[in-house]
């Protein structure tokens, strides 16, 4: 149980370091969107899918990118991306296309100076290690990012 409490403390510590201003701006973007598209890859993709489900339960119009039932994007839509590195090629390509079509881009990441960080209109930096990072954390690879991003 001690290890479990240490992990919870680690998540709480990181959560307290996330910028309230960034979260407020992202919240306003979510509230103002006509439709919200969400995408992530790997474990970050699992977290973004869970977030999409929560937004749906809150009454927002949401779709997961790549699903057969996803509508076409239009101006006034929001594309939320979860990417620890901010460099996942498929997500970068999707973000560029969406941006070119007038879609607002929101990003949850550890790396605001990444390619996705440069493309995004709204960024929430989750100050954890990415899977490429050598920083020490109790949890392996990007686990802390994934848990905190949810």
Predicted regions span which residues?
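Glycine-rich phosphate-binding loops that contact phosphosugars or nucleotide phosphates
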Residues: 37-41, 46-149
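Generic N-terminal amphipathic, Lys/Arg-enriched alpha-helix
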Residues: 1-16
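Generic secondary-structure signature for well-ordered alpha-helical cores
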Residues: 13-20, 60, 128-129
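Short, contiguous, pocket-lining structural segments
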Residues: 3, 22-25, 43, 55
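A short, well-structured juxtamembrane/interface segment
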Residues: 16-32
